[in-house]
């Protein structure tokens, strides 16, 4: 069975069959014709020899997904979304960890610069992009500066809106003394969150915020929150955390100091990981569409590889109000 048989059954040319089965028909072939080709191929039991075609085109049908940590649930969800879309198009996804997401990444192309078709990089610090660009492959950035020159496409989450939603929720609860617990990571996404928090509080004359940074671990966050809560000046009544892991550490700090969440101190997170409902009280947090981020990232890479304009998106987020926030005590 060959593509010629499919073309004859569908009443089209072999070139049209190649376009449709190679998923390059959009803008060249009508949906009706594409459907007829797929139906004819299915009826005849025809499957194109992708390996031969890819060898001819110099393709490996493999994408590299760069994430800061393999153990982080958010990035596991990103991979799930990317792998699902990749599988639908006959691609595979290889995961490459860039530990902590900071500093210069080890060059992933050292072993073979021809074993990949493109790179999707998630929430990377700026310095870690050097090796990615050195590979000379199409790069799609996730949750990164859309104005940056490094990427062929970007897929973003509206983290600024998420931070504004959290801040407005806490302001409505009467909070005016804020602590921002931020990761010690030089990343665009965290700068955007900090700017959004500061901007939302700037319009409230009696509101104040100070920032404490921490490594992205529960214990480091606990120590940072303890320092902030026992430091000089009035104690913050609201701890705004850039990640649910940081928020879990902040909750531990509050309890160790003999205080209560949320009666004495409200705590909010970001991501809506499984951890958010595993702690007590459950975390008020911002739900990020991690799986959709991965799916859109893979779709954008496929568009770049097929010389189609990738879709620029800023995916919406949702504030999830749970038990860790309440009205300010004073």
Name each region found by the language model.
Residues 14-19, 55-69, 169, 177-184:
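Short beta-strand segments enriched in small/hydrophobic residues
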Residues 115-123, 177-182, 211-212, 232-243, ...:
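Periplasmic-binding protein-like
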Residues 122, 142-143, 157, 181, ...:
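Generic beta-sheet signal
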Residues 1-58, 329:
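N-terminal helix-turn-helix DNA-binding module of bacterial transcription factors
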Residues 50, 67-77, 95-104, 154-165, ...:
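Hinge/beta->alpha junction and helix N-cap segments in small-molecule ligand-binding domains
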